[in-house]
Amino acid sequence: MTREVIIRKARKKDIPLIAELWKELMDFNKQYDGHWSRSENGHQSCADFINDHIADDASCILVAEADNHIVGYCLSDICKCDPQLLKVKEYGQISNLAVTKNYRRKGIGERLLRKTVNWFSKKGIYRVEVCVGISNKSARKFWTKVGFTPFVENMFLEI
């Protein structure tokens, strides 16, 4: 059962499907930390965010499509640094990269990432960051496998 998977820029009509995949991603992530529990209307906020950024030159929203179904997506942006503090003026931020359960471990995530990194490179961005849950071993393994290196650890205190 090999299906051709196409990686392409997201279109407005893809937004509800991406929002559904976002729900799947968040439900997957909450098993590692309850902090990732989504709100009841979180998917609508996600859809609104994507709608606001889909045509933005500083955003790259890609989808993986198989048999006319969206099976993965990657949401990324160019972020600005304070030029008075850091030599690096801009960097790439990957907010989400998700592949639906039945299509995982088939190289789709890596293909989405490669195309995203290529987009950043064409924009003159040479550093890309991603936030990974510390207890999500499968995500940490994926990001390490594709060349990412830990550089900061965020900590929290519940009061």
Give short role names for the model-derived ranges.
Residues 110, 122, 134-152:
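Conserved active-site alpha-helix within GNAT-family acetyltransferase domains
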Residues 49-62, 93:
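A short helix-loop-beta-strand connector motif used in the catalytic cores of GNAT acetyltransferases and
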Residues 120-131:
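Conserved GNAT acetyl-CoA-binding A-motif
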Residues 27-49:
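Conserved GNAT-fold acetyl-CoA-binding loop/helix
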Residues 80-94, 104, 126, 150-152:
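A conserved beta-turn-beta hairpin within the catalytic core of GNAT-like acetyltransferases
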Residues 96-99, 105-118, 145:
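Conserved acetyl-CoA-binding loop-helix of GNAT-fold acetyltransferases
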Residues 63, 69-78, 93, 98:
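Conserved beta-strand in the GNAT
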